[in-house]
Design a protein with these regions (language model features):
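N-terminal strand-loop-strand
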Residues: 1-15, 42-43, 47
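Short glycine-enriched, charge-decorated loop/helix-capping segments at active-site entrances
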Residues: 15-21
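A generic structural signal for short, non-catalytic loop/turn and secondary-structure boundary residues
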Residues: 9, 79-80, 111
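Charged phosphate-binding loop/patch that engages nucleotide di/tri-phosphates or the phosphate backbone
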Residues: 107-131
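Short acidic/polar capping segments at secondary-structure boundaries
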Residues: 6-7, 91-92, 123-125
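Unchanged
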Residues: 21-44, 54-104, 130-131
Length: 131
């Protein structure tokens, strides 16, 4: 997991490493590159396990592709993006997690679910649905 401090980031807490897709890059290539840049690990065979998305105030939509990988080489190293560490799965709920990490992880692990959708903002956050 990667910890992003509130002092240096728009959002903070423990979450998965991530990033953006560069021009001419496939989604799978971008996840391999981003994981290496942020953790020092080179992953193999990333598998798409879900999509997280929400509407933007401009009328567009922000889409996050969630991948998992079980094969990797290299040594875990933190980066300017945040501190990284291995965490036992049963200890994750005890961490200071980024917004909605637990329900996102549940969606990613559910064989019959593939989308975490923030429908619209509410007074106390978002109206959310998992498909």
């Amino acid at each position: 997991m990667q910890y992003r401090s509130p002092e240096n980031n728009r959002w903070s807490g423990y979450a998965f490493p991530g990033g953006h897709v560069e021009n001419g890059e496939a989604f799978a290539e971008s996840v391999i590159r981003e994981i290496y840049e942020e953790t020092g690990l080179t992953i193999q065979n990333p598998q798409l396990v879900g999509i997280k998305n929400w509407p933007l105030d401009t009328g567009g939509r922000y889409i996050v592709f969630c991948y998992k990988a079980t094969e990797f080489t290299g040594s875990l190293q933190s980066s300017e993006e945040g501190e990284v560490s291995w965490v036992q799965k049963d200890q994750i709920p005890n961490l200071e997690l980024a917004y909605d990490m637990l329900p996102l992880m549940e969606m990613m692990e559910a064989p019959d679910k593939s989308e975490f959708f923030y429908r619209h903002r509410t007074e106390d956050g978002w109206e959310k649905e998992i498909f």
